[in-house]
């Protein structure tokens, strides 16, 4: 029988993992809210941010590397939108989805070519990895920092969307793309800002994830990306609060499943079983709005 401290550590671990999924899931849900596009390359942007840090930190201090990594991640996200999605804006959705999958494989194979398929050690960030004693529990500082930083970023994002001009434009475009164009809203600027925000949050998630995990490989973005996608669908894709809540639920459940040796092997399967159940029982997710097709 485990004591209370064991379950508290599991809960903290689940909240931390859920926070990382939330940061990635917001990128999925924002892009879908604006473009009705599932950006399947989003998990690979997260992976590329990890490699940016590996190579930049080899010649720069962490104080320089972290801002540079975030900047390069944002530029990568915007470049993908301009090169792979913008030319297909009026194309059938299937064409855009195939393009997104193609970009995902392109990034994976590019990383594989550069690294030779070998995992690279992530630079140590002592501020994150230092072990703290909190209430008799020995936990890494990153376990506390991750959920706090995630909540702070989500609050800032909600304020930006609700209170600023670009945020109001985003809400207008997500409601009615065609009418927003007719009303003079700069659609390209709104879409670019959406990719800037999503890629920035993926970059932050990458730093927090790999600082704790310790190494980066070309395929490592696939599973966190897919789990974040499930979180976005669970909460209601297009809903930022829904994506965050869905991510926390998945992270906590995953943590408790992994702690049970009998069913630990099914931790990944649980996430995708949950996706099937959601699609069967509540296709719009917990907080998603029912969309109507215009004819």
Regions found by a protein language model. Give the residues of each.
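Membrane-interfacial amphipathic/re-entrant helices at transmembrane-helix boundaries
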Residues: 1-23, 52, 63-64, 91-98, ...
